[in-house]
Regions:
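Acidic/histidine-rich catalytic neighborhood of metal-dependent amide-processing enzymes
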Residues: 1-34
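Metal-dependent amide/peptide-bond hydrolase catalytic core
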Residues: 36-195
Length: 195
């Protein structure tokens, strides 16, 4: 919708984008970046498991570190207008595919996920931080330091964004909300990349 109107040449002083906000005024949003992680292993028959390297076990190390990394990132940023300061830029693994056969040590795991970008943080900086985290974590593992995971960025790459709460469009929306409900509007940030 929004992008189509811009491409067609429509302009405006402001825009109201309809997202499921429960009628909250949401002038600030986190960004969201889609990524793919490929974790290498070394395949061998399960009867000789000790001669192989399970990509699933190596992925488990990386996954646990991503959960800790998410917590660390939330301690570094101080962003107003969110329901919880610990839930501004979530990192989520949405799909995992690994192994070819039940009796083979898995040679690779491919995990795809979504990396949250804090308001005020550029997508470029967020990507670099994530890639650096994966690189540093890999250096602490005997296998991964020589066979590091591959990070790819694809599909949705949404920057964070915000509109000053004193901006006339925010003030107008808040006033309309008050006139309609008799209540003061709730200003709240959203944790997703909106168009």
């Amino acid at each position: 919708g929004t992008l189509t109107n811009i491409v067609k040449g429509f302009t405006a002083d402001g825009a109201v984008i309809l997202e499921p906000t429960s009628l909250k005024v949401c002038p600030i949003q986190s960004g969201a970046l889609t990524f793919r992680l490929t974790i290498p292993g070394r395949a061998t028959h399960a009867a000789m498991r000790w001669d192989g390297v399970s990509a699933i076990e190596k992925y488990s190390l990386i996954h646990q570190s991503i959960l800790e990394f998410e917590k660390e990132r939330h301690q570094l940023f101080n962003v107003q207008y969110y329901e919880s300061k610990r839930r501004v830029a979530p990192i989520n693994i949405g799909t995992i595919k690994g192994g070819e056969w039940h009796s083979t040590v898995p040679e690779s795991v491919v995990a795809e996920g979504r990396f949250g970008v804090f308001p005020g943080e550029s997508a470029k900086d967020a990507r670099e931080e994530f890639e650096n985290h994966i690189r540093q974590k890999s250096k602490s593992d005997e296998w991964l330091k020589d066979n590091p995971p591959i990070v790819e960025w694809f599909e949705g790459q949404f920057e964070s964004g915000q509109t000053d709460t004193r901006h006339p469009i925010i003030q107008s929306l808040s006033e309309c909300y008050f006139q309609s409900t008799g209540d003061k509007s709730i200003i709240e940030g959203v944790t997703y990349g909106s168009d």
